A protein has these predicted regions:
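Carbohydrate-active catalytic/glycan-binding domains of CAZyme proteins
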Residues: 1-257
Length: 257
């Protein structure tokens, strides 16, 4: 929808429009990447525009009569790409918050090469501004990994990696305390129910020789499922839980655009 038409210097026509990429089975209309911007070929049948001629569905790529424009320092925003942030400078514009912070609760100068976040009582289950910095999921098949230093003191202190659609639809992979022991936990939001708006799906009790180590957390998206893993050396990975329902975060289930 919302199509604009563009004619190039050689007389060819293209359209810029919005669309979505559902995971299989396509008829279920489950997609976790939101509405996206597409550039598709078009032509005219009299005064009637014909989008994507020759195809029923929009294709993943087309040949364009243009040379790629890649300025110095360009960070890819579409297609297949890898992005890594060492947090050595100011916060990149690709990172987003949940609502506008009223004060600074993060720092890139407290420890060089680290993004330091303050522990605060606000959570992602509430319509507030929690200690949350994220990027949008841009791929159906992808993974996101963080390296983290965190030493919780009680069960209310948690930090980790979250995949979030809204306050009632998210999965949270974190390090915390449970029954007095250090653990890696996976939570699922409770879809508007009580139980503090999330419940535990699985956990791993951290061994004594692992407690003071950095922890690596990873979420892999594989179409309509997610996989949640952890490591203490970024080499040997353990799956905490696999084949987790990703459609729970889809627009069809959780709402939104």
């Amino acid at each position: 929808g919302h199509a604009d038409y563009v004619q190039t210097n050689d007389g060819k026509w293209y359209s810029v429009l919005l669309g979505s990429r559902p995971s299989e089975p396509f008829e279920k209309k489950h997609f976790n990447t939101g509405r996206e911007t597409y550039l598709v070929p078009m032509n005219w049948d009299g005064d009637w525009p014909i989008m994507n001629p020759g195809f029923k569905e929009v294709q993943y790529s087309y040949s364009l009569p243009l040379k790629p424009y890649i300025p110095k320092g360009y960070i890819p925003q579409s297609g297949n790409f890898t992005y890594k942030d060492e947090f050595n400078n100011k916060l990149n514009n690709n990172w987003i918050f949940l609502r506008t912070p009223k004060f600074s609760w993060y720092s890139l100068s407290q420890k060089k090469g680290f993004l330091s976040l303050k522990l605060r009582p606000e959570t992602c289950s509430e319509k507030v501004n929690p200690s949350f910095i994220a990027r949008r999921q841009q791929h159906i098949f992808s993974n996101a990994t963080i390296k983290m230093k965190f030493y919780p003191r009680n069960h209310n202190e948690k930090a980790g990696l979250i995949i979030f659609q809204n306050e009632d639809h998210f999965y949270y992979l974190c390090k915390s305390i449970m029954d007095g022991k250090n653990v890696i936990q996976l939570y699922k939001s409770s879809n508007g129910n009580d139980q503090s708006k999330m419940h535990i799906l699985d956990f791993y009790e951290i061994k004594k020789n692992e407690i003071n180590k950095d922890v690596f957390l990873k979420i892999e998206s594989k179409g309509n499922i997610y996989s949640f893993s952890f490591s203490f050396d970024n080499k040997k990975w353990s799956i905490l839980k696999d084949s987790v329902d990703a459609t729970f975060l889809s627009t069809e289930t959780a709402g939104g655009f």
